Structures are given as structure tokens and as C-alpha cells.
């Protein structure tokens, strides 16, 4: 996905072709690889009640798709970068076994599984298998890469990482409509090469420097979760914080899931982020 940034890069960020998943490949041969996905949104659109086979966006279908990517890449770990479930307030009783079952199926592939809490993940922790590693909204660092959801300020440790990976934005790109696809909407990756100088809004807000030279925003894993057509519309207020503050002072480009470079993106002014304490983990590492 484009040329790498200058300087030493200990971990390769490799988008999985034709899939909304990012593979972290450390240079060290003994280091495990991690597959990063975001915005799974289990329970979206009434998919719990629909009859028949697993519908698009259902937990079973999403688990099948994620397991297929795990087997295809041979990864040793899976990290969900926020919004594992869709309901924002709590976890409805009907959704609780679905959440547990989804993560249990991924764990059954003998991979380490983690979740960085997103704004939709309030109340999810008691309904996860105990083997799932849970990280707060401030994010975590894997092999030098800072990973967070994007709705709240990352921790200072994450901010100091050389590269950042986030979700939350549901990035998309609108192509010319066709008879087969009248809307022309596509999920996409956003990749930014930033200037090394830290962004001023971060210095004022957190007294911390954003040292990342490369930022990657992953597309929503759930295909029915909707997209922000970044080449046509300004992101919704709840998502523009990430797009404005963290992607500023750099060059942003969009790539379709098949790797097609569809060009540069405008970066609008950001809105205020949520507090980092808005979503907290009951346990984590």
C-alpha cells in the first residue's frame, strides 16, 4: 500500500489483499504476527433475528470471514481495534451469547485474541471469554505500532509510537456509479505519511508529541456498518476528530481493498475528541 516511510521500520504493515484486515509482521523471526481488524459491530441491523442462513453482517458470517483470513495469513494473533459490538449502551441479553461465541470461535483457531475498547464496547467485557486480552480506549503498542480505536485520546505511550493504526472512521471512497452498483461506495484504507514535527493541537491538549510518521486507518470489518465517503463528504462529527487532528500535517491517500490507489484525500478541521476515560477496561494488559 504505497511506498514505506523513510528510516528504520521494525514491523511491516501489510493490508491483506481483498480483505479489511491488516497484518503486523515484525522483522524478528521469533516474534508473533498480529492481524488487526476494527468495527465488527456484532448485532448490527437486527441480524440476530433474521431467519435462514447466516446473513451478511451476522456474527456467524463475520466469524467465518475472520477465521478464513486467520488461516490464509497464518497469523498468531488477532486484535480487534474497537467496536466489537454495535449497541452503544450496554449489551442486550440476546447479544451476550453472540459476543461470547464470536470470540470463542476465533480463540478456537489457537490464536491470541485481544480487544481495544471502542465507543460501542461499553459493558462488553463481562461477556467475553476470559482468554481475551482487553485494552482500554487509550490503546496498546504491538511491536512498535500504536493501536487504538479513534474515538478518544490515545495514551502517551501509543502517541510516541513510530506508526499508528486506528479504526472508528469507517473510511470509504465513492466511485462513479454503474448499473450494477448505483451507489459506487467502496470500503477503503487511509494511509498518511506525516511530517516528523508533532501536531500543535496535540501539544496543547495533552502536552504530548505525536511522533508517528505513518498512520493507517483500517476499513470497517462489517460490510453493512456503513462508510464515510471521504472523497465526497466531511466525516460525521463523531468521527472527524481522528480524521482532522491525527491525519493533519501529512499527505493522506485512499486505497481500495484490492490495493488500488484511488488518490489523495482532503483533511478537514477536527472536532473535539471524547475523554480517554469514556470507555474503560475491567481487565487488560
Predicted regions: what is each one?
Residues 1-81, 85-285:
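Extended recognition/assembly regions associated with phosphoester-bond processing machinery
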Amino acid at each position: 500500500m504505497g511506498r514505506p516511510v523513510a528510516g528504520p521500520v521494525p514491523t511491516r504493515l501489510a493490508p491483506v489483499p481483498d480483505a479489511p484486515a491488516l497484518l503486523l509482521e515484525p522483522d524478528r523471526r521469533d516474534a508473533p504476527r498480529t492481524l488487526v481488524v476494527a468495527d465488527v459491530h456484532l448485532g448490527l441491523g437486527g441480524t440476530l433475528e433474521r431467519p435462514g442462513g447466516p446473513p451478511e453482517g451476522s456474527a456467524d458470517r463475520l466469524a467465518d470471514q475472520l477465521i478464513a483470513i486467520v488461516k490464509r495469513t497464518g497469523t498468531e494473533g488477532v486484535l480487534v481495534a474497537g467496536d466489537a459490538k454495535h449497541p452503544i449502551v450496554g449489551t442486550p441479553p440476546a447479544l451476550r451469547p453472540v459476543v461470547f461465541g464470536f470470540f470463542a470461535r476465533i480463540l478456537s483457531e489457537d490464536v491470541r485474541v485481544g480487544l481495544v475498547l471502542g465507543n460501542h464496547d461499553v459493558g462488553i467485557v463481562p461477556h467475553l471469554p476470559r482468554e481475551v486480552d482487553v485494552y482500554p480506549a487509550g490503546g496498546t503498542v504491538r511491536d512498535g505500532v500504536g493501536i487504538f480505536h479513534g474515538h478518544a485520546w490515545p495514551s502517551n505511550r501509543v502517541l510516541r509510537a513510530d506508526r499508528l493504526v486506528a479504526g472508528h472512521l469507517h473510511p470509504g471512497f465513492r466511485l462513479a456509479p454503474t448499473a450494477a452498483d448505483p451507489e459506487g461506495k467502496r470500503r477503503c484504507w487511509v494511509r498518511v505519511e506525516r511530517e516528523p514535527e508533532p501536531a500543535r493541537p496535540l501539544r496543547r491538549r495533552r502536552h504530548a508529541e505525536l511522533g508517528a510518521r505513518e498512520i493507517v486507518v483500517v476499513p470497517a470489518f462489517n460490510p453493512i456498518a456503513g462508510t464515510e465517503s471521504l472523497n465526497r463528504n466531511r466525516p460525521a462529527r463523531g468521527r472527524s476528530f481522528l480524521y482532522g487532528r491525527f491525519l493533519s500535517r501529512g499527505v493522506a491517500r485512499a486505497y481500495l481493498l484490492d490495493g488500488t490507489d484511488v488518490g489523495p484525500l482532503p483533511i478537514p478541521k477536527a472536532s473535539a475528541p471524547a475523554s480517554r476515560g469514556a470507555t474503560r477496561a475491567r481487565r487488560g494488559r
